[in-house]
Amino acid sequence: MILKNFIVFEGIDGAGTSTQIEILKKRDDADRFFFTTEPTDSETGKFLRKMLKGDVELDPRTSAFLFAADRNEHLYGTGGTNCGVVAKAESGKIVVSDRYLFSSLTYQSVTCGDELPRRLNESF
């Protein structure tokens, strides 16, 4: 999917993606932007954050499915304050996301191979 007004900061842990987004938030014209993250703050995203902190243990394939579900909510849903990216971008907001598709493809490929993450995310 190609989405106008959608900018993603990707990078390994500690690469500075969040730092760059914080710099953007301090701009005078920051109201033109809609800032978001993956995992989202939807219920699925909150569960994924617990998993990432080690509070919940899941099979890697299960987590791959949940990340794809959270990405769908991120793009189209209304289940969190940072969801509904497509609607925000189409309304003229510049959407800036801290992580997106390539993070899933990279991290999940390590734990469950290339094929499943690629198939789950091919529509994104």
Regions found by a protein language model. Give the residues of each.
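Hydrophobic residues on the short alpha-helix immediately C-terminal to a glycine-rich phosphate/catalytic loop
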Residues: 24-27, 51
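Hydrophobic anchor at the beta1->P-loop junction of P-loop NTPases
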Residues: 9
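The conserved Walker
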Residues: 13
